Amino acid sequence: PKDAPIMIWGGQTFEMIASFLGCVKSGHAYIPIASYSNAERLTMIQDVSKSPLVLEIDPLPEVDLTDVKVLKASEVEDGDFEVNEKDFVEGDDNYYIIFTSGTTGKPKGVQISHDNLLSFVNWELSDFNLPEHPSFLAQAPYSFDLSVMSLYPALVSAGKLVVLPHDVTQNFGKLFQTLPKMQFNVWVSTPSFAQMCFLDKTFDQEHHPDLSHFLFCGEELPHSEAEML
């Protein structure tokens, strides 16, 4: 149906971002769902959103989604579609819907309009004196609103996303081996994730010579952490 939101199941990949843009250019908000989520979360989100379609970028778990069409990435890539600017999401239309964790019950959908997103991106790019064509650390899965702080500013500024996969962030050994090898100049995370990285002796200017900006959201930034940085 026209204006119905579309669920997108997958990880931190190019195909996910391409799917986001495909949805909004066809007039539909998208609902990103991380592929490490369980089947119950997927069904609860569908029950709340009434989404009639899920794009399967990564393999779906065994799940019974009644009256929901499953479209594989290969079917989209091989399809023949027309793009009409009149269909684009704009103004007060929902651009994306991100669902809460649901720890206190059913997940709740937070609806963000095109104008909301545009205002946020313009603010970030104009107020923080970021490098030209910035390279952002993309640590948060796209199902978290934190990810928007790197995703769309990177797209608008012809920048780059340097992805830190979810499985790496869950393993200190992998994390502390991987971070020093990554090249980015804008750090985006929660304050608590940065605090965790203080445990690594290589989390310093010597091992991250290009890093010029720290952008935090989602939590309060303690004064002590700001001083350490």
Indicate residue ranges for each PLM-predicted region.
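Carrier-protein-dependent adenylate-forming modules in NRPS/ANL systems
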Residues: P1-D115, F128-N129, A158
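Conserved S/T- and glycine-rich ATP-binding loop of Class I adenylate-forming
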Residues: I6, C23, N94, T100-T103, ...
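Adenylate-forming
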Residues: G11, L60, A140-S143, D167-V168, ...
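Hydrophobic packing residues within well-ordered alpha-helices of enzyme cores
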Residues: S19, V63-D64, E124, C197, ...
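Short acidic active-site motifs
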Residues: E40-R41, N171-K174, S224-E225
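Short, conserved loop/helix-junction motifs that constitute active-site signature segments
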Residues: Q46-S49, L130, F203-D210
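Core-facing hydrophobic residues within beta-strands of well-ordered domains
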Residues: S51, V89, F184, H208-L211
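Conserved AMP-binding/adenylation subdomain of ANL enzymes
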Residues: K108-L137, D145-N185
